[in-house]
UniProtKB/Swiss-Prot annotation:
Ranges of Polar residues composition bias in the record: 370-380
InterPro entries: GvpD_bR2, GvpD_P-loop, P-loop_NTPase
Miscellaneous comment: Encoded in a 14-gene locus called mc-vac. In Schmidt et al., GvpD comes from H.mediterranei while GvpE is from the c-locus of H.salinarum.
Annotated region (Basic region 2), positions in chain: 494-499
Region (Disordered): 352-418
Binding sites annotated in the UniProt record for ATP: 39-46
A GO term, aspect molecular function: ATP binding
Protein's name in the database: Protein GvpD
Subcellular location: Cytoplasm
UniProt keywords, alphabetically: ATP-binding, Cytoplasm, Nucleotide-binding
Gene field: gvpD
Residue numbers spanned by region P-loop: 36-46
Region of interest called Required for interaction with GvpE, as start-end residue ranges on this chain: 318-362
Naturally occurring in which organism (per UniProt): Haloferax mediterranei (strain ATCC 33500 / DSM 1411 / JCM 8866 / NBRC 14739 / NCIMB 2177 / R-4) (Halobacterium mediterranei)
Effect annotated for changing residue 39 to A: Does not repress gas vesicle overproduction in H.volcanii
């Protein structure tokens, strides 16, 4: 076969990473496997198959066989812009089944069910590791069966085909015309089903269900997918530690704020929101169940970074389950210590032990954390001041070693990250109070001389804010600030936050992936990914269409 078109050669991101790993392992493990691809019309079966051929072409020859439309039309619709495969990889059995991209000696003039297996054997003999996709298998069977007076049924032919594939180490994809269960599922080695539906607000939800894959352990049977840009892509899991940076990874380049908007700090999200968050607005970040304890940082960290990089003040009341020192460690790795110490104010409070500090839960139901590497240790849960103590000790140590306090400056390690002597902490007895908080941020405003960002976990700040949300929203609007209110599953605080919020976003888990979507404004489902090609990992969003 001709060499792949270099313009469309699959990269790691375009191929194996975005193609389900379990399916790749299914084909690259034991040779001779046959995969049945089920799904109703419009679910993306053909695009899934083409993506698979792109992946498998890297270690062998591939052939896409159809009877639906001619070679040129198939190539124009599915291959030309989105695949490394050219027309020679496409075969229309209804036109000329012997017009092959290989030098094949076929000892018969007409292709039928009785000669199909021999035809495949001749192709295999002229190729290296071979993959053939039949799309759709039912239509190809019917076309070939029409040439016989007394043809065997499709189950018999499929059994013979699968047996040949195992014997000759041929990889097969059989695309079905239906999503319904069929006897073919018991014959083949693997079965996947593509599904599509709309939620109550009209959002498209697409999934790939891994029914069975011989020889492969399936940890997550239902995987979110998208057909964005006319290509099949699996929306892959995100490990939250990769969202954050390590020491000396790079310097955050500030994104531009406009007179009407604050940048979200996420390049893919700003255009969806017509430039970012409105000035003077309240954003509700609604966390779904079974998210790791640091999931709140996915949407908020980029905004915090961008405010600080623009030398604007930030006040953060993080969730009490959050990793100790998360903000301090992240922000000091992408911004100068002076910027963090001057403009960022983090209030760690203690509001009682959580039943499971490693995850968000709903109505008493405890879920397994997505990111077990970030789960709190038993000592964290047992210490009544675990989060505060660990963070403050780290801050105190780093300040004393790198930035000694100026004469007369007080470092209040028990209540907030850094507090000058002229600022009185709003945290008393481990609890945040509303009026002292407002007085504190007014002093911060004088120092930064501009709008402020408030990031407040409502679960942590409940006693201070639950009866004052209306007043707080008015304050934010009056001063052209930005506030992000974070709520956890199954609490009344969700409804209260919604009543004052100008925008409402929800972060939820789908399979092992993390999805973001807007309830107000209404947005599509957006899969969260990470671009690690830059010194600072960047959030990327993939629309589910």
């Amino acid at each position: 076969m001709p060499p792949p078109n270099p313009a469309y050669s699959p990269t790691e991101q375009q191929g194996r990473v975005l193609f389900p790993r379990e399916v790749s392992r299914f084909f690259t493990g034991d040779p001779g496997h046959t995969l049945l691809v089920n799904g109703a019309p419009g679910t993306g079966k053909t695009l899934f198959t083409i993506r698979g051929l792109d992946v498998l072409e890297r270690d062998g020859d591939v052939l896409y066989v159809s009877t639906r439309v001619d070679q040129d039309t198939v190539h124009e619709m599915y291959f030309r812009e989105h695949s490394s495969l050219d027309k020679t990889h496409i075969l229309d059995l209804s036109q000329d089944p012997f017009e092959l991209p290989l030098d094949v000696d076929v000892p018969f003039e007409k292709l039928g069910l009785d000669s199909l297996l021999e035809w495949i054997q001749q192709i295999k003999a002229a190729s290296k590791r071979l993959t053939i996709a039949f799309d759709s298998w039912e239509l190809i069977y019917e076309y070939l069966a029409s040439r016989h007076d007394d043809s065997p049924d499709i189950e018999t032919v499929t059994t013979q085909l699968v047996s040949l594939a195992r014997q000759e180490n041929i990889r097969l994809l059989l695309v079905s015309e239906t999503a319904d269960s069929s006897p073919l599922e018991y014959i083949v080695d693997g079965v996947v089903t593509l599904q599509v539906a709309e939620d109550e607000r009209g959002r498209t939800r697409r999934y790939l269900r891994l029914e069975k894959l011989r020889g492969v352990r399936i940890g997550n049977r239902l995987q979110p997918i998208t057909l964005a840009d006319g290509q099949f892509q699996a929306i892959t899991p995100v490990e939250l530690p990769t969202v954050r940076t390590g020491a000396n990874n790079g310097t955050w380049e500030p994104r531009t704020n406009t007179k009407a908007k604050f940048s979200t700090g996420i390049g893919d999200l700003d255009p969806i929101l017509s430039g970012g968050y409105n000035r003077g607005s309240v954003i509700h970040l609604d966390l779904g169940t079974d998210l790791s304890r640091d999931a709140w940082s996915v949407l908020t960290l980029p905004t915090i970074r961008n405010f600080l990089a623009n030398e604007m003040g930030v006040a953060v009341v993080p969730p009490r389950e959050g990793s100790p020192g998360l903000l301090h460690n992240d922000l000091n790795s992408v911004l100068t210590p002076r910027v963090f110490d001057t403009y960022c104010h983090v209030f760690e409070t203690y509001a009682g032990p959580s039943r499971n500090r490693g995850t968000y839960e709903e109505d008493g139901q405890v879920e397994t954390p997505l990111d077990t590497s970030q789960t709190a240790t038993p000592s964290d849960a047992e210490s009544p001041v675990g989060t505060e103590t660990e963070l403050s000790e780290k801050v105190e140590t780093e300040l004393s070693e790198e930035n000694p306090p100026a004469p007369g400056e007080v470092v209040d390690t028990e209540r907030s990250t850094t507090i000058g002597k002229e600022l009185e902490s709003p945290v008393e007895g481990g609890q945040l109070d509303y009026e002292p908080y407002m007085e504190y941020v007014e002093e911060v405003r004088k120092q930064s001389d501009g709008p402020l960002l408030h990031v407040i976990s409502m679960d942590t700040a409940r006693t201070a804010f639950e009866t004052r949300l209306g007043d707080f929203a008015n304050y934010v609007a009056l001063h052209n600030d930005l506030a992000i209110l974070i709520t956890k599953p199954g609490t009344e605080l969700r409804r209260r936050a919604d009543r004052v919020a100008d925008m409402h976003f929800r972060l939820e888990r789908s399979g092992e992936a993390i999805m973001l979507y807007g309830e107000n404004p209404l947005t599509p489902l957006l899969g969260i990914g990470i671009d690690r090609s830059q010194p600072i990992p960047e959030i990327i969003l993939t629309e589910m269409v």
